[in-house]
């Protein structure tokens, strides 16, 4: 594998892993290469992202590397997030949002377990729309990100606090979480909790 191919593989892994990032050890295991080789390629790739003409950077958080946007470009991303708040959410995003709203703080993997499918794209959508955010790190291997709702979530759904969320049925069946998410949003609509936009 050439250096460019190695860097392309690292870049792809960072992209796929998203906010959780990937540790150097995980990269070495995935790529089946030594720490020295992977770290040198990663550092050179990270240096290439420091170019002013790039919108992304590679950062290290809690011993995990991840792709993130450059802070100086935040005003553009905020405009984008605010404009996309007006458009509808997919069924997957609605399910994910309902799970996070009721079970926060919660990791992506825990959301995946409840839904029975991967939720990374839905979480990225909800994060970009400022409806959820990172609220901490779980204990344990990799210290996964914990997600919770934001003040924008409360505002968007006309809630003063999370205590105003409609109660879920006590006999909730996790295998039918899509139906439960529909029930959640129907209850919110019936209670006139949605803003008319």
Swiss-Prot record:
GO terms for cellular component: cytoplasm. InterPro entries: ScpB_csome_segregation, WH-like_DNA-bd_sf, WH_DNA-bd_sf. Keywords: Cell cycle, Cell division, Chromosome partition, Cytoplasm. It holds the Pfam family SMC_ScpB. GO terms for biological process: cell division; chromosome separation; DNA replication. It comes from the Bacteria. It is found in: Cytoplasm. Participates in chromosomal partition during cell division. May act via the formation of a condensin-like complex containing Smc and ScpA that pull DNA away from mid-cell into both cell halves. NCBIfam families: SMC-Scp complex subunit ScpB. Belongs to the ScpB family. Homodimer. Homodimerization may be required to stabilize the binding of ScpA to the Smc head domains. Component of a cohesin-like complex composed of ScpA, ScpB and the Smc homodimer, in which ScpA and ScpB bind to the head domain of Smc. The presence of the three proteins is required for the association of the complex with DNA. PANTHER family: SEGREGATION AND CONDENSATION PROTEIN B. This is Segregation and condensation protein B.
């Amino acid at each position: 594998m050439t250096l460019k191919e190695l860097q392309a593989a690292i870049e792809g892994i960072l992209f796929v892993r998203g906010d959780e990032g990937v540790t150097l050890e995980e990269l070495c295991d995935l790529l089946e290469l030594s720490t020295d080789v992977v770290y040198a390629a990663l550092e050179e790739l990270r240096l290439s992202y420091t170019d002013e003409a790039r919108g992304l950077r590679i950062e290290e958080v809690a011993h995990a590397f991840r792709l993130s946007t450059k802070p100086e470009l935040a005003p553009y991303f905020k405009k984008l997030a605010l404009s996309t708040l007006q458009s509808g959410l997919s069924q997957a995003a609605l399910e994910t949002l309902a799970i996070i709203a009721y079970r926060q703080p919660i990791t992506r993997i825990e959301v995946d377990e409840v839904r029975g499918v991967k939720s990374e794209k839905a979480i990225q959508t909800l994060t970009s729309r400022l409806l959820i955010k990172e609220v901490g790190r779980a204990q344990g291997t990799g210290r996964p990100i914990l997600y919770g709702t934001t003040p924008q979530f409360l505002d968007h759904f006309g809630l003063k606090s999370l205590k105003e969320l409609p109660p879920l049925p006590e006999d909730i069946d996790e295998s039918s979480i899509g139906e439960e998410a529909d029930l959640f949003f129907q209850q919110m609509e019936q209670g006139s909790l949605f803003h008319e936009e």
